[in-house]
From Swiss-Prot:
Species classification: Archaea, Thermoproteota, Thermoprotei, Thermoproteales, Thermoproteaceae
Any GO BP annotation: translation
Pfam families listed in its UniProt record: Ribosomal_L7Ae (PF01248)
Xref: NCBIfam families: eL8_ribo
Purpose of the protein: Multifunctional RNA-binding protein that recognizes the K-turn motif in ribosomal RNA, the RNA component of RNase P, box H/ACA, box C/D and box C'/D' sRNAs.
Name of the coding gene: rpl7ae
Matches recorded under HAMAP family: Ribosomal_eL8
Location in the cell: Cytoplasm
Known partners and oligomeric status: Part of the 50S ribosomal subunit. Probably part of the RNase P complex.
Record's protein name: Large ribosomal subunit protein eL8
InterPro entries according to UniProt: eL8/uL1-like, Ribosomal_eL30-like_sf, Ribosomal_eL8-like_CS, Ribosomal_eL8/eL30/eS12/Gad45, Ribosomal_eL8/Nhp2, Ribosomal_eL8_arc
Length: 151
């Protein structure tokens, strides 16, 4: 059964001072943990970098976690990712800076989005991170999204 989400209501209430595609506020410590998980997964697992790669990974069912930068300009570049992640039931988290996201992904330029495909040695940290993100989502009235392959 396909999930249908109305984009008008989906993007209705971003946190104050955040772009319209941000659905919940991520504390700085959780965002840093997400960048750390991405960095470890880059070294010991598998990641994808960039919005196009992230979109393909989610659509193909490969993504374990999607990281989306909050400072993307224009915001329409990544605006589809939260909606796509919700539809495909893939956990996602926002990080404050595309520069930090690019650095954590191991590239010398900024990245609007990145995806953990295989967490490698960050598997336990990834589970804890997704659990924490789901707690944040619950506080904002959003449903939990478990790790793919988990209930």
């Amino acid at each position: 059964m396909a999930v249908t989400i109305d984009p008008k209501t989906f993007y209705a209430n971003p946190p104050p001072g955040k772009p319209f595609y941000v659905r919940f506020e991520v504390p700085a410590d959780v965002a840093e943990k997400a960048l750390e998980v991405l960095s470890v997964a880059k070294q010991t697992g598998k990641i994808k970098k960039g919005t196009n790669e992230a979109t393909k990974a989610v659509e193909r069912g490969l993504a374990k976690l999607v990281l989306i930068a909050e400072d993307v300009d224009p915001p329409e570049v990544v605006a589809h990712l939260p909606l796509l992640c919700e539809e495909k039931k893939v956990p996602y988290v926002y990080v404050p800076s595309k520069e930090k996201l690019g650095k954590a992904a191991g590239i010398n330029v900024s990245a609007a989005a990145a995806v953990v495909i295989e967490p490698g040695q960050a598997a336990g940290e990834l589970e804890a991170l997704v659990s924490k993100v789901n707690e944040i989502r619950a506080k904002n009235g959003l449903n939990a999204i478990p790790l793919p392959g988990r209930k």
